[in-house]
Amino acid sequence: MAFKVFVDGQEGTTGLRLLDYLSQRDDIELLRIAEDRRKDPAERAKFLNAADVAFLCLPDVASREAVSLVDNPNTCIIDASTAFRTSDDWAYGLPELAPGQRERLRNSKRIAVPGCHASAFVLLMRPLVEAGIVPADYPITAFSLTGYSGGGKKMIADYLAADNPKLQSPRPYALALTHKHLPEMRVQSKLALPPIFTPVVGNFLKGLAVTIGLHPQHLASKVSPADIAKVFADYYQGEQFIRVAPADNVETLDNGFFDVQGANDTNRADLFVFGSDERMVVTARLDNLGKGAAGAAVQCMNVHLGVDEATSLHVEAPVKAEGPAHPVREAAPDFAT
C-alpha cells in the first residue's frame, strides 16, 4: 500500500522539488489539491489530515496556521519553514546530527527541516563542539556563498535578464546580523552564542558553501587540520550523504580554486579542512535546493517511514539529458528559510 503524501505550498522552490523527487515513486500516492482551492483552509485541512506525511513549504506564519489545521494524530508533518527548528517538540531534520537522531525522526510526527545555511554550519560545528575542541562560547564567524535560486522568482528573473551589472559581482546580505538561521545554528551546534554570520549571493543558480575560520591557539585543545578532518571522518563514519575530504587535499580544488557547485544535484554534503597549525578554515558544501531543502525533507520522510533512506536521492549527480534548464520553475523565497 502506498503512503499518502500531501505538499502544502507545492508552487514554490521546495514544493516543486519535492514533487520532482516523489512523483516517480510507486510507494507514494501524491494527494493533489485543486489549484483554486490551495488557499482554502477547509480544503487544505482535508488534505493535511488525509495524509500519512504532509510537507509544509510555506512561510513561518502560514506553516503555524497549517499545523493548527491538523488533528489527525497519525499525520507526520515535515515543515520547511524556520518556525519550529528550535522547538523541543519537533525533531530537527538532520539525520546525521547525532547518534539517536534517526530514532527520533522515526518516532516523531513533527519534523523541522533545517535551513540550507544552517545545515552546512551545523554539520561543521556540532562534531567539533561534541569533541570538546571548539568551546561552546567560542566567537564563531561564518561566511556563506550561495546561488541565487534561494531568492525566489523575482531574483531568478533578475539574474537571468542579465541587464543589471551590479548582479555580476557577489552581493552580501543580512548585514544587520539577524539572519533567520541564527537560532538553529546556535541551538543545534550546542553553542552558547550565535555566530557572526555573513551570507553572500553569487551569480550562479545553486550551490552553497559555508566557511568558518578557526585559530587553534584559542580552541580547547591544540589541533592540526588533519586532526579536524579525522574528527569529521570519525563523527560521520558510515554516513552515505556526508563526504569528508582529507585535510589540505589539493585534488579537491580546481587549480587552487574551490568549486561551490561541486555537490549540486545531489543530497550530499562535502566537508573540507584547509590551513595550518596556526590558522585554518573548515568548509561545508551542499546543493541549497537538495541537501539544503527538498532533498533533506525527502530524507527525513524516508527515515520516518522506515524505507531506504536514499530512495529518490543521489550521492552522485545524475547524468543530465541535453536540453534547456528551467530555473524559474525552481523559484520561491528561500533566503529566509
Curated annotation (Swiss-Prot):
InterPro entries (UniProt xref): AGPR_type-2, NAD(P)-bd_dom_sf, NAGSA_dehydrogenase, Semialdehyde_DH_NAD-bd
Alphabetical keyword list: Amino-acid biosynthesis, Arginine biosynthesis, Cytoplasm, NADP, Oxidoreductase
Top-level lineage group: Bacteria
EC number(s) recorded for this UniProt protein: 1.2.1.38
Any Pfam family hit: Semialdhyde_dh
Catalytic activity: N-acetyl-L-glutamate 5-semialdehyde + phosphate + NADP(+) = N-acetyl-L-glutamyl 5-phosphate + NADPH + H(+)
SMART domains: Semialdhyde_dh
Enzyme class: oxidoreductase
GO cellular component: cytoplasm
Parts forming coiled coils: none
Pathway(s) served: Amino-acid biosynthesis; L-arginine biosynthesis; N(2)-acetyl-L-ornithine from L-glutamate: step 3/4
Protein's cellular compartments: Cytoplasm
One example of a Gene Ontology biological process annotation: L-arginine biosynthetic process
Primary residence: cytoplasm
Database matches in PANTHER family: N-ACETYL-GAMMA-GLUTAMYL-PHOSPHATE REDUCTASE, CHLOROPLASTIC-RELATED, N-ACETYL-GAMMA-GLUTAMYL-PHOSPHATE REDUCTASE, CHLOROPLASTIC-RELATED-RELATED
Family the UniProt entry places it in: Belongs to the NAGSA dehydrogenase family. Type 2 subfamily.
Protein name (Swiss-Prot/TrEMBL): N-acetyl-gamma-glutamyl-phosphate reductase
Organism: Ralstonia nicotianae (strain ATCC BAA-1114 / GMI1000)
GN (gene name): argC
